[in-house]
Amino acid sequence: MALTPTDVSRIALLARLELSEAEQSAMLSQLNGFFDIVERMRAVDTTGVAPLYTPLSAVQEVALRLREDAVTEVDQRQANQLSAPAVEAGLYLVPKVIE
């Protein structure tokens, strides 16, 4: 899939970009280079290849480095709600905006 200068002009118009002729030519070259890479990746047969969440998992066992989900802050709900105009059962009350 190769883009034309007309395509780049339309993309620039939609993005509200003002491109000079030199910028438009450079953008055309960059976008076509990107689409060339995408086409080459599409051509690779990946049937039977398991997806990787990190490239390291292809060469070694990788454990997810996630922290334990633990509460680290104290509950300050009541203090935070002191300045609210209306609170009920620990919830902020707001005016109805959609009828």
UniProtKB/Swiss-Prot annotation:
A Pfam family that the UniProt record links to this protein: GatC
Keywords: ATP-binding, Ligase, Nucleotide-binding, Protein biosynthesis
Keyword ATP-binding: yes
GO annotation terms (biological process): glutaminyl-tRNAGln biosynthesis via transamidation; regulation of translational fidelity; translation
InterPro entries: Asp/Glu-ADT_sf_sub_c, GatC
UniProt catalytic activity: L-glutamyl-tRNA(Gln) + L-glutamine + ATP + H2O = L-glutaminyl-tRNA(Gln) + L-glutamate + ADP + phosphate + H(+); L-aspartyl-tRNA(Asn) + L-glutamine + ATP + H2O = L-asparaginyl-tRNA(Asn) + L-glutamate + ADP + phosphate + 2 H(+)
E.C. number(s) listed in UniProt: 6.3.5.-
GO molecular function, a single term: glutaminyl-tRNA synthase (glutamine-hydrolyzing) activity
Source organism, top-level taxon: Bacteria
Family: Belongs to the GatC family.
Subunit architecture: Heterotrimer of A, B and C subunits.
Function: Allows the formation of correctly charged Asn-tRNA(Asn) or Gln-tRNA(Gln) through the transamidation of misacylated Asp-tRNA(Asn) or Glu-tRNA(Gln) in organisms which lack either or both of asparaginyl-tRNA or glutaminyl-tRNA synthetases. The reaction takes place in the presence of glutamine and ATP through an activated phospho-Asp-tRNA(Asn) or phospho-Glu-tRNA(Gln).
Listed name of the protein: Aspartyl/glutamyl-tRNA(Asn/Gln) amidotransferase subunit C
Species, as recorded: Methylibium petroleiphilum (strain ATCC BAA-1232 / LMG 22953 / PM1)
